């Protein structure tokens, strides 16, 4: 517990990315694409999600979308300007657009998505005030998804 509190105080991005990574592991255990997301406000988790596209037969059931919905329901508000989204993989264009409309205050992602990430389309998909940080736990976040797809081939 002491180490957890210390990490939260000294490196909150890594702390919350570890929790997003746990969501990705849950997706992996259900044979879903292993991506996890957490929405945080004032160091409190208010939404979380992992990919459930196969389980729900819903192409929009990405980790970010589920986490945004949970956070909005928790707050009773559609705008998340004071919130930070932690997600293990760079959001796709669909999720980036949803993050724009939700006015997410900050996005922290682990690994870049060289094939389907929003930055491959445009850096202007997000709200102009949204701050972006990347590369938190990049190696672990990249490995879980790379290994998943290697196992599928």
Kindly give the residue locations of the regions a language model identified.
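A cytosolic small-molecule/anion-sensing beta-strand core signal
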Residues: 41-42, 69, 81
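Short beta-strand scaffold segments in enzyme catalytic cores
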Residues: 35-43
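Zinc-dependent deaminase
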Residues: 1-28, 91-153
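A short, polar/charged loop-to-alpha-helix boundary motif
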Residues: 55-65
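Short loop/turn microsegments at loop-to-beta-strand junctions
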Residues: 12, 33-35
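Small-residue (primarily alanine) positions within well-ordered alpha-helices
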Residues: 20, 24-27, 37, 47, ...
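Short beta->alpha transition motifs characteristic of CBS
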Residues: 46-53, 129
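Immediate flanking context of iron-sulfur cluster ligation sites
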Residues: 77-89
